[in-house]
Curated annotation (Swiss-Prot):
<feature type="compositionally biased region" description="Low complexity">
    <location>
        <begin position="673"/>
        <end position="683"/>
    </location>
</feature>
<feature type="cross-link" description="Glycyl lysine isopeptide (Lys-Gly) (interchain with G-Cter in SUMO2)">
    <location>
        <position position="142"/>
    </location>
</feature>
<feature type="region of interest" description="(Microbial infection) Interaction with Puumala hantavirus nucleoprotein">
    <location>
        <begin position="627"/>
        <end position="634"/>
    </location>
</feature>
<dbReference type="InterPro" id="IPR046378">
    <property type="entry name" value="DAXX_histone-bd"/>
</dbReference>
<dbReference type="InterPro" id="IPR046426">
    <property type="entry name" value="DAXX_histone-bd_sf"/>
</dbReference>
<feature type="compositionally biased region" description="Basic and acidic residues">
    <location>
        <begin position="650"/>
        <end position="660"/>
    </location>
</feature>
<dbReference type="GO" id="GO:0003713">
    <property type="term" value="F:transcription coactivator activity"/>
</dbReference>
<dbReference type="InterPro" id="IPR031333">
    <property type="entry name" value="Daxx_N"/>
</dbReference>
<dbReference type="InterPro" id="IPR038298">
    <property type="entry name" value="Daxx_N_sf"/>
</dbReference>
<feature type="compositionally biased region" description="Polar residues">
    <location>
        <begin position="578"/>
        <end position="590"/>
    </location>
</feature>
<feature type="modified residue" description="Phosphoserine">
    <location>
        <position position="580"/>
    </location>
</feature>
<feature type="compositionally biased region" description="Low complexity">
    <location>
        <begin position="529"/>
        <end position="542"/>
    </location>
</feature>
<feature type="modified residue" description="N6-acetyllysine">
    <location>
        <position position="512"/>
    </location>
</feature>
<feature type="region of interest" description="Necessary for interaction with USP7 and ATRX">
    <location>
        <begin position="1"/>
        <end position="160"/>
    </location>
</feature>
<dbReference type="GO" id="GO:0016604">
    <property type="term" value="C:nuclear body"/>
</dbReference>
<feature type="modified residue" description="Phosphoserine">
    <location>
        <position position="213"/>
    </location>
</feature>
<feature type="modified residue" description="Phosphoserine">
    <location>
        <position position="688"/>
    </location>
</feature>
Length: 740
């Protein structure tokens, strides 16, 4: 009897004889009495006679004893889980009787029992191992009936028929196994002979010289060698199956790659199973690794977010790819070559001892390099030619596109399509056409900007010329004003306009006088903005005044108040070259200003009295003036100094005496409605050089005749005012468009 710690030597003959014994499996209570089992176990030996000698080992009793000891150990260690012992007992009952009486099961029980006693903390590991072994050797359901019938028939005294019925079955199994073993041996011998034949043929094909002309031949030596190697691999696999051994040869590519790249063991096991699965050496892609990570996370409920799973899969894919590449590279290095290179040593070169071989190698090397240079130069020239042709085609295509785009912009604009749309239809390459169209549009925009700059420069030059001409004609205008005022003084006309002129002259302060030269310098040095000053001429009130050649009297307009900025009326002025109707009615020889200055009227606000084209005058009188308004920033610079609340725009009225010795400047006081007169904002002036913003279609005098003084005058009687919104002539034509 072998003990638990003894080494058991396996013998195939003993195992076969032990397997040939009927050895019915007894239940656990019967196994506890070895005295009762001795007669039953000795009966088959006595029946077999000489075939069953006393020296033959029987492991059935020993296995039952070891199993009982393991169950007792499990009862003591697994008191918290009483279901473990019945589970092990059921597994042992389901196992095959031949396996229970085998030396393999004895070795397994001895090893498990010794390890469980030495390391009780891992008892469940050993229990699982034993259960796995018993499950692998469990008998089928139809075979479980025989032990049950045997146990049920034993107490009835029918033991000899039972043994007789079991002996033929075992004999048939033994007879069927023996020819199968002999047949497998014949197959193994035949396969080994075939493998030797394949190896010899492969060696012969490897030693054969391979010509370049045989590469396209389906029966070349290289292809024959490849086919024989595939057959050799299949034969080797079949031979390993017959011999019941592993087919691993120890190559690097067959080694298992352990993976511990992540902190989750479940994910590591899944990835390791993916990269080490049997079959062809397939390199997994990122999708395979990501699916493996997602399956592991879903199955084990790791609760990882999608982004973390993706990052983990990316890192794992990089690590796995590097490991697989290294393994494949090492396998190529170790298995490269054939039997001809087995005896090669790096320090042994036959060319060192054979000069003829060395010369032949040098010639072959020079020939190979020359042929390689010829091939490279040939295809380099072809590449240069193709690139040059492509360059010419591209250049011609670009030229055709540019010419087409230059011809079609006008038609495309007329048809409502942009130049880019036409170019994209005419050119096969949309991207190049769009690039050309963008260049054309940029060039057109640059040309338009240059034209606008030229127009602005021309406008500025024309305005400067107009100012110079107006300043030159200042002297003539002043002389004409003197003559007209003298004639008006002699005339006995009692019109409201004449009375206003007389009252204005009486209220003048004689001390406010300046020299003519200083007035001219002041007018020339100051640029009067049309958006800040607003004037309207006083036309003659009767036909007698027109016949006397009276010049319309100028009255000043005060600054616009903040209340007057609510509504503004913008009326386009007449061209510079067009003479006004007042000029034609008064005198054809008299010359008016060439550029009218503008202002904006507010609807309903009182303005300076203005005689319309039909000669009607609307007299209105007001009392004291209202509070002064603030000045704009631009007007502050022009007026020089003075308090903000009392400053206003003054009219310079020059009275030239007949001897031409002095000029009298007559400032006009602010009126309540004049303070409400709006001043046109500088941003409302039109860009056209020949048009401006005016309050009415009446003629406006030259701005050179305007002046500003830093002091204010006391209020005087109100003047006649009229509004352009209520006193416009119905026959007057007012142009409201900015276009030419």
């Amino acid at each position: 009897m072998a003990t638990a710690n003894s080494i058991i030597v396996l013998d195939d003959d003993d195992e076969d004889e032990a397997a040939a014994q009927p050895g019915p499996s007894h239940p656990l209570p019967n196994a506890a009495s070895p005295g009762a089992e001795a007669p039953s176990s000795s009966e088959p030996h006595g029946a077999r006679g000489s075939s069953s000698s006393g020296g033959k080992k029987c492991y059935k009793l020993e296995n039952e004893k070891l199993f009982e000891e393991f169950l007792e150990l499990c009862k003591m260690q697994t008191a918290d889980h009483p279901e473990v012992v019945p589970f092990l007992y059921n597994r042992q009952q389901r196992a095959h009787s031949l396996f229970l009486a085998s030396a393999e099961f004895c070795n397994i029980l001895s090893r498990v029992l010794s390890r469980a006693r030495s390391r009780p903390a891992k008892l469940y590991v050993y229990i699982n191992e034993l259960c796995t072994v018993l499950k692998a050797h469990s008998a089928k359901k139809k075979l479980n009936l025989a032990p049950a019938a045997t146990t049920s028939n034993e107490p009835s005294g029918n033991n000899p028929p039972t043994h007789l019925s079991l002996d033929p079955t075992n004999a048939e199994n033994t007879a069927s196994q023996s020819p199968r073993t002999r047949g497998s041996r014949r197959q193994i011998q035949r396969l080994e002979q075939l493998l030797a034949l394949y190896v010899a043929e492969i060696r012969r094909l490897q030693e054969k010289e391979l010509d370049l002309s045989e590469l396209d031949d389906p029966d070349s030596a290289y292809l024959q060698e490849a086919r024989l190697k595939r057959k050799l691999i299949r034969l080797f696999g079949r031979l390993c199956e017959l011999k019941d051994c592993s087919s691993l040869t120890g190559r690097v590519i067959e080694q298992r790659i352990p993976y511990r790249g992540t902190r989750y063991p479940e994910v590591n096991r899944r990835i390791e199973r993916l990269i080490n699965k049997p079959g062809p050496d397939t390199f997994p892609d990122y999708g395979d690794v990501l699916r493996a990570v997602e399956k592991a996370a879903a199955r084990h409920s790791l609760g990882l977010p999608r982004q973390q799973l993706q990052l983990m899969a990316q890192d794992a894919f990089r690590d796995v790819g590097i490991r697989l590449q290294e393994r494949r590279h090492l396998d190529l290095i170790y298995n490269f070559g054939c039997h001809l290179t087995d005896d090669y040593r790096p320090g042994v070169d036959p060319a060192l001892s054979d000069p003829v071989l060395a010369r032949r190698l040098r010639e072959n090397r020079s020939l190979a390099m020359s042929r390689l240079d010829e091939v490279i130069s040939k295809y380099a020239m072809l590449q240069d030619k193709s690139e040059e042709g492509e360059r010419k085609k591209r250049r011609a295509r670009l030229q055709g596109t540019s010419s087409h785009s230059a011809d079609t912009p006008e038609a495309s604009l007329d048809s409502g399509e942009g130049p880019s749309g036409m170019a994209s239809q005419g050119c096969p390459s949309a991207s190049r056409a769009e690039t050309d169209d963008e260049d054309d549009e940029e060039s057109d925009e640059e040309e338009e900007e240059e034209e606008e700059e030229e127009e602005e420069e021309a406008t500025d030059s024309e305005e400067e010329e107009d100012l110079e001409q107006m300043q030159e004609g200042q002297e003539d205008d002043e002389e004409e004003d003197e003559e007209e005022e003298a004639a008006a003084g002699k005339d006995g006309d009692k019109s409201p306009m004449s009375s206003l002129q007389i009252s204005n002259e009486k209220n003048l302060e004689p001390g406010k006088q300046i020299s003519r030269s200083s007035g001219e310098q002041q007018n020339k040095g100051r640029i009067v903005s049309p958006s800040l000053l607003s004037e309207e001429p006083l036309a003659p009130s009767s036909i007698d005044a027109e016949s006397n050649g009276e010049q319309p009297e100028e009255l000043t307009l005060e600054e616009e108040s903040p209340v007057s900025q609510l509504f503004e009326l913008e009326i386009e002025a007449l061209p510079l070259d067009t003479p006004s109707s007042v000029e034609t009615d008064i005198s054809s020889s008299r010359k008016q200003s060439e550029e009218p200055f503008t202002t904006v009227l507010e609807n309903g606000a009182g303005m300076v009295s203005s005689t319309s084209f039909n000669g009607g005058v609307s007299p209105h009188n007001w009392g004291d003036s209202g509070p002064p308004c603030k000045k704009s920033r631009k007007e502050k610079k022009q007026t020089g100094s003075g308090p903000l609340g009392n400053s206003y725009v003054e009219r310079q009225r020059s009275v030239h005496e007949k001897n031409g010795k002095k000029i009298c400047t007559l400032p006009s006081p602010p009126s309540p409605l004049a303070s409400l007169a709006p001043v046109a904002d500088s941003s409302t002036r039109v860009d056209s050089p020949s048009h401006g913003l005016v309050t009415s279609s009446l003629c406006i005098p030259s701005p050179a005749r305007l002046s500003q003084t830093p002091h204010s005058q006391p209020p005087r009687p109100g003047t006649c005012k009229t509004s352009v919104a209520t006193q416009c002539d119905p026959e007057e034509i007012i142009v409201l468009s900015d276009s030419d």
